[in-house]
């Protein structure tokens, strides 16, 4: 466990008034008519609402605590996908989007939508960073490498964005373009890559530009937990041409399937071609993923001065590296679509009132309760304590350890709440999402039951402290683990997510969205939400 406690209060904030009771006539009071602290927001990642069935691990699991909370407390459902979280209609939500909307208290229009709009109105093809990247490759007679997730999942990348990159390269007369395709199988069906690769091949044929270089499962190319041994395999394929070999992209996938590998786990494979597709000195690389967390490590391997994650060999290539969005500010790389940070997010408001706040998660979801929850701000706010609990590293996938680090997360959360004067806490339980992605229903059931046990411990302490738990999820996953044909579904769902408030004298209004959680927390804390927050309190007085 690592902790980071940043003390401080807004100018003029009285010391030690975290638990002061405001004037009863204050319109900021919660529907219960009293301030309740601490408010603990529990995000049960990947726990959606769906009819019971053989593919719904949520309904299959024994969750007596969750069931009791639903029976005894105000509850309802929230929208967590599509326009309700700033995504296109029908697009499933994800952890980044979910936590951003939760913490911001408003619908935050996502990079997926923003980039797609730029393509539609033509601004994409005038983007200075992208045009300059193409100009460098064309002017030097070097290769433009387009790397990223080739997937229709819409969680980390978008097929239309890659096609637009290829079109831009053709317009800018880049003669050598290589697509390094990372395969999905988590946010798409486990063996769906061949269709996506064929779609991109058709685009390359129509434009007369581009060829495939390396085919790799995201397990290797898109790790986010510093498992550098995995990333090294992808890097070595890209730079040194090491790994499996195949005549073309389709053959690479066929061979992987014969080895028993689904898309996510395809070992890095070099597509044999007449021209060398390796990344070399003077080349230009564009990572086209719009979501940063799983693009960051491979980017660091190419662009971080003094990189020490693994041995990159005697001569790592000196390249111009460009990213679609900002993956890591400290790298100082050109970014095609810089971040647009919402202001006056929940963490900011709490800091401005001199209130202490606690953010807890295991490694897999740590960025979500910090960076994303705080509106894309990396540094902690005043009075913010962060606790990171390491995710298990002794298993290849979490179906082998479905409890993950949930019990450790709970231990740290309870110890901090019992020993500190926190007004607010947010905690993420990663299990339903991370184990749901494995497609192993029995493991997902065990994961949910572990979270339910932790839920009971947290609610018990918070109730004893006089506080309120807000129980919800950022998106669905474990609620939809089978396709209609009986094959595994490892992607997120577009189902509604639960919302439970352990508050008395209130009921949950209908039509809620994730962006309504921050205003709800502020109301329970007796604070007025800022005008930038356009969400609304989910609780209203009982009749």
Predicted regions and their residues:
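Feature captures the catalytic ectodomains and active-site-proximal regions of enzymes
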Residues: 2-543
């Amino acid at each position: 466990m690592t902790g980071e406690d940043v003390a401080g209060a807004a100018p003029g904030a009285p010391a030690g008034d975290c638990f002061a009771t405001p004037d009863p006539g204050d319109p900021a009071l919660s529907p219960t008519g009293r301030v309740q602290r601490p408010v603990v927001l529990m995000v049960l990642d990947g726990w959606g609402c769906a009819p019971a069935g053989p593919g719904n691990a949520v309904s299959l699991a024994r969750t007596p605590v969750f069931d009791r909370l639903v029976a005894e407390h105000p509850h309802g459902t929230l929208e967590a996908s599509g326009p309700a979280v700033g995504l296109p209609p029908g697009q499933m939500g994800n952890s980044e989007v979910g936590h951003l909307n939760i913490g911001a208290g408003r619908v935050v229009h996502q990079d997926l939508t923003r980039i797609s709009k730029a393509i539609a109105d033509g601004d994409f093809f005038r983007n200075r960073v992208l045009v300059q990247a193409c100009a460098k490759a064309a002017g030097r007679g070097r290769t433009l490498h387009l790397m990223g997730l080739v997937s229709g999942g819409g969680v980390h990348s978008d097929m239309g964005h890659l096609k637009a990159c290829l079109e831009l390269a053709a317009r800018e007369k880049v003669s050598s373009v290589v697509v390094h395709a990372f395969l999905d199988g988590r946010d798409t069906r486990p063996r769906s890559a061949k269709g996506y690769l064929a779609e991109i091949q058709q685009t390359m044929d129509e434009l007369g530009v581009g060829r495939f270089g390396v085919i790799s499962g995201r397990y290797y190319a898109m790790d986010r937990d510093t498992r550098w041994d995995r990333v090294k395999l992808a890097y070595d394929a890209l730079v040194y041409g090491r790994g499996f070999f195949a005549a073309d992209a389709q053959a690479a996938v066929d061979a992987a399937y014969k080895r028993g590998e689904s898309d996510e786990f395809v070992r890095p494979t070099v597509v044999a071609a007449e021209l060398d597709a390796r990344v070399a000195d003077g080349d230009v690389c564009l990572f086209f993923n719009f979501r940063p967390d799983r693009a960051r490590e491979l980017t660091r391997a190419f662009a971080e001065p003094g990189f020490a994650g693994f041995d990159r060999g005697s001569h790592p290539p000196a390249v111009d590296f460009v990213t679609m969005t900002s993956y890591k500010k400290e790298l100082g790389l050109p970014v095609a679509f810089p971040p647009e940070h919402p202001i006056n997010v929940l963490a900011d408001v709490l800091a401005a009132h001199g209130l202490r706040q606690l953010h807890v998660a295991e490694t897999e979801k740590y960025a979500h309760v910090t960076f994303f929850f705080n509106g894309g701000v990396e540094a902690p706010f005043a009075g913010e304590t962060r606790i990171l609990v390491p995710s298990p590293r002794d298993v290849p996938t979490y179906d082998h350890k479905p409890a993950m680090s949930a019990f450790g997360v709970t231990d740290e959360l309870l110890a901090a709440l019992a020993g500190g004067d926190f007004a607010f806490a947010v905690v993420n339980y990663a299990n339903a999402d991370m184990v749901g992605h494995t497609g192993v229903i029995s493991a997902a059931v065990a994961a949910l039951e572990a979270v339910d046990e932790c839920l009971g411990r947290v609610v018990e302490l918070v109730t004893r402290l006089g506080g309120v738990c807000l129980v919800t999820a950022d998106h669905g996953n474990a609620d939809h683990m089978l396709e209609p044909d009986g094959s595994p579904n490892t992607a997120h769902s577009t189902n509604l997510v639960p919302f439970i408030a352990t508050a008395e004298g209130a009921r949950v209004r209908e039509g809620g969205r994730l962006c309504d959680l921050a205003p709800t927390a502020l109301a329970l804390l007796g604070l007025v939400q800022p005008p930038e927050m356009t969400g609304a309190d989910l609780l209203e007085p009982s009749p």
